[in-house]
Structures are given as structure tokens and as C-alpha cells.
């Protein structure tokens, strides 16, 4: 999926907002997380993730040297994580093992995982089709505190565009 000029500008602006939250990014090596909802078709992921990462790399020197975590969210009980160079995730071979899994998932379970295992990440991009469910809005707000709400950027793929939602 090719990003439009508007989507590119929105992405850059939102990422800058996240990185400039007081106490978040201090100028050293950036640690970031890319969470992909396995409900997305393989072709969409294979096109969109590299486009997003290359856009960020072109945007700022901060993304030249990144500790990159790639997480595939398959179900509430199945989440796979890889630590790799960010540029590896821009190659088509990186997605050879990707398999689409449309299962019912709870947003709260993903947030709980991120709270426990990805607390060091200064930027968390979540690429989804929006098919997850939210069972308890209060629980979501609670899990967003103290840090997830300042670091999480939800990117929802629709048929022809990318919706960027800054979750505070």
C-alpha cells in the first residue's frame, strides 16, 4: 500500500509527537516496536510495513540506528516477537513465513503484552484492520497508563487508505 502525501505527513507528525513527549526519547539509540495484526492479508503487510519503515527512515536520522522489535499478534494467547534490524523488515523475504489468521482477539490482551514485554520501546506502531474487540473501555484506559498512551500509534488499514490514530 503506497502512502499518500497526507498519510505520510500525518505519520511523520504523529511519530514526532510521540518521540518528543517529555521523558520518552532521550536521543540515544531508539528502541521501537512494530505490532502487526495477523488478520491482515499477507500482501497488505508485505507492502505496508516496508513503506512505513522506509518513510520513517527517510524522515529522520533517529531511524538510522534502531533496536527494532517485530511482533505478530495472532490471537490472545499467541504472540510472536522477533528482534531484528529494521531494514530486514523492509525486504520481501522477511514475510515468507507470514500467515494470515483471522481470529477473535481482545485489544486488552495485546495492551497487557505490550505493558509486560515491550515497556522499553519508545515508539509502538500497531498495524491492524481494526477487527479486534474491546471488551472493557475502562480496562483499556487503565492499561494505557502510565506509558502506552504516550507511545502507541494505531495504524488501521482500510481498502484504499491508512487511518492514523494517536492513542493517548
What are these regions (language model features)?
Residues 49, 138-145:
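Conserved Walker B catalytic segment
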Residues 54-59, 112-116, 142-143:
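A generic secondary-structure signal
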Residues 25-127, 131-137, 155-165:
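Von Willebrand factor
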Amino acid at each position: 500500500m503506497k502512502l499518500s502525501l497526507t498519510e505520510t505527513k500525518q505519520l511523520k507528525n504523529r511519530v514526532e509527537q510521540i518521540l518528543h513527549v517529555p521523558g520518552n526519547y532521550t536521543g540515544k539509540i531508539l528502541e521501537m516496536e512494530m505490532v502487526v495484526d495477523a488478520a491482515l492479508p499477507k500482501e497488505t503487510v508485505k507492502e505496508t510495513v516496508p513503506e512505513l519503515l522506509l518513510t520513517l527512515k527517510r524522515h529522520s536520522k533517529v531511524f538510522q540506528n534502531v533496536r527494532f522489535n517485530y511482533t505478530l499478534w495472532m490471537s490472545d494467547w499467541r504472540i510472536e516477537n522477533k528482534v531484528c534490524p529494521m531494514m530486514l523488515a523492509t525486504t520481501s523475504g522477511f514475510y515468507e513465513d507470514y500467515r494470515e489468521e483471522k481470529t477473535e482477539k481482545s485489544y486488552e490482551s495485546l495492551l497487557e503484552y505490550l505493558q509486560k514485554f515491550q515497556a522499553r520501546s519508545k515508539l509502538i506502531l500497531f498495524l491492524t484492520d481494526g477487527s479486534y474487540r474491546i471488551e472493557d473501555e475502562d480496562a483499556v484506559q487503565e492499561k494505557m497508563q502510565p506509558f502506552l498512551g504516550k507511545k502507541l500509534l494505531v495504524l488501521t488499514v482500510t481498502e484504499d487508505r491508512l487511518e492514523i490514530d494517536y492513542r493517548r
